[in-house]
Amino acid sequence: MASYDFIQTDSELASLVALLRRRERIAVDLEGENNLHSYGIRVCLIQLFDGHRGYIVDPLAIRTKDLLKELFEGSGWLKVMFDSTNDLLALRHELGIKPSSLYDLAIAAQLLHRPGGLHALRDGPHSARAKDRFQKSNWLRRPLPEAMLDYAISDVLDLLDLADALAADLAKEGLTAEFDRRNRERLDKVRVWDPLGNFTRIPGFQRMRRAGRERAKTLWYAREYYARLHDLAPENVASKPQLAKIVELGLRDGEAIARLLNESRQRNRVDPRDFGRLLADAERDAERNTETLARRGG
């Protein structure tokens, strides 16, 4: 395990930004929260490795968020990442950051027909078992156990070596230009988090009649509003199968819906008054968004 510095203050981060300006490329990874333990998308840790030493930045402890922006946008070094899609979305959504450069190893692996994720490219011990151990960890908790910090930094330690190996294979196969094109396309893509747009994931949605679909959409909105108000993961308010059940039973008011959701539930019990109030807001907003799409021809 390489040595690493844990960056938790603005002054430490400012010094790191100045230091990394002298580097040509840095391996980067994020640990985040995505509607698993609380509401929304959060950047919880930023892991960096310059080929010699590792750095873990705690963005929750940084007061001057512009320093985080400077780290990713004001630096000239190449950001070497693996499967950056979710990380780029999190940076953009929470911090308003769009990295100035990118080298995504997942694109290279795809072009070279090497499936299986990052652990499949590795020969070391940091494989799927280690990933599974921390897959659902709460990265918002503080202080973080040393084992979680060690795991976090381990995810970037071999990215630069992998980048060299994959770049050589791309060149050998004549795929460098195609990699550059796809890599630039991923970096330039506009990313917007739209939690209200996923109501079609409710089981059986496509088989519902029009009234059922409209009700499912309203319930999805209400679930999002309640989760945001109480800082809960939406699935801890109502699972997607529960939403489908509510539609099937024709439940219309907050009291009846909360009663169903709270069956056999000790934690995260749904407040019927809050849900009923938000359900009214959801009905209005869902109808308004449907009308807007209709006017646009969507």
What are the residue ranges of the model-derived segments?
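DEDD superfamily 3′-5′ metal-dependent exonuclease/proofreading module
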Residues: M1-C44, L48-G298
